[in-house]
Amino acid sequence: MAAAAAAAAAEQQSSNGPVKKSMREKAVERRNVNKEHNSNFKAGYIPIDEDRLHKTGLRGRKGNLAICVIILLFILAVINLIITLVIWAVIRIGPNGCDSMEFHESGLLRFKQVSDMGVIHPLYKSTVGGRRNENLVITGNNQPIVFQQGTTKLSVENNKTSITSDIGMQFFDPRTQNILFSTDYETHEFHLPSGVKSLNVQKASTERITSNATSDLNIKVDGRAIVRGNEGVFIMGKTIEFHMGGNMELKAENSIILNGSVMVSTTRLPSSSSGDQLGSGDWVRYKLCMCADGTLFKVQVTSQNMGCQISDNPCGNTH
């Protein structure tokens, strides 16, 4: 409207000459000019209170997600700082380098102080040792010390040391290379090391078991002992004694031969009174008999005062 009024005034002035304006018209014209002048500085701007203004930034769920990500990054930064401080305190990195360990060009890692470790995994063909003229001390805090390579394991505890291996084991002197103990029975005969008085095993497979000429061979078990041979079992000695709390069972496919002086204590053998009826109940009676050559055999008792003279016996003519 202001532009139309200005155009009409210009046409009137051009056709009729200069036209004098009143004070009111001049004030209105001056106000319009000021508005147009000020609008040049606000070109391209939109009032911030405009309802149709496009809203930017993270709002709603996106804003909450952004806050969670920022908090998570802050927590990770704090954890990283704590780990860095712990590593710095343990390794003791200072102006002069690392005070707790040394790294050498040959690949040697040397610890300069007492180190607390959980599990150590040496590299292939690596060595763990101590300094010259100093002992290497390895201790466990109320736990066993375990050295393991593949299926071979050495466990050192307070009251025992156990070695487990599926491929055998061998002990030798590192200076003289002399084999002290080996389980390679095809090459070396099995001998207990000097100072070892007993060997505790659950199952052993060997060709023979012998003792020294001046000592006895004692085989002790807490439960049941089974001695089995593929081609027979031969027990030889100056004196052979069997002490057991239960039953002793001898089984053989062909025969059982006892050579030498055989002593059988009958105090523990079950016996029945002479007044019992033969064959009463579920019991079957046998009489223990011995041949002149030491062969033992049993005879079923079918009548009173029955002896060992039966037709079917392993003694032959003499019994």
Curated annotation (Swiss-Prot):
Q: Which UniProt keywords apply?
A: Cell membrane, Cytoplasm, Cytoskeleton, Disulfide bond, Glycoprotein, Membrane, Signal-anchor, Transmembrane, Transmembrane helix
Question: Per the UniProt entry, what is one GO biological process?
Answer: glucose homeostasis
Give a GO cellular-component term: sarcolemma
Main localization is: membrane
Q: Where in the cell is it found?
A: Cell membrane, Sarcolemma; Cytoplasm, Cytoskeleton
Glycosylation annotated at which residues? 159, 212, 259
The positions making up the signal sequence are none
Stretches the record annotates as Disordered: 1-33
Coiled-coil residues:
none
> What membrane topology is given?
Single-pass type II membrane protein
Task: Name any one Pfam family assigned in the record.
Answer: Sarcoglycan_1
Q: How is it modified after translation?
A: Disulfide bonds are present.
Q: Which residues cross the membrane?
A: 67-87
**Which cysteine pairs are covalently linked by disulfides here?**
289-315, 291-308
| Segments on the Cytoplasmic side according to the record's topology features | 1-66
Q: Where is the composition biased (Low complexity)?
A: 1-10
UniProt topological domain (Extracellular) ranges: 88-318
Q: Where is the composition biased (Basic and acidic residues)?
A: 22-33
PANTHER family to which the protein is assigned, alphabetical: BETA-SARCOGLYCAN, SARCOGLYCANS
Q: What family name appears in the similarity comment?
A: Belongs to the sarcoglycan beta/delta/gamma/zeta family.
Described function: Component of the sarcoglycan complex, a subcomplex of the dystrophin-glycoprotein complex which forms a link between the F-actin cytoskeleton and the extracellular matrix.
**How does the annotation summarize its subunit structure?**
Cross-link to form 2 major subcomplexes: one consisting of SGCB, SGCD and SGCG and the other consisting of SGCB and SGCD. The association between SGCB and SGCG is particularly strong while SGCA is loosely associated with the other sarcoglycans.
* Name of the molecule in the record: Beta-sarcoglycan
Q: Which organism is it from?
A: Pongo abelii (Sumatran orangutan)
Identify the gene encoding this protein: SGCB
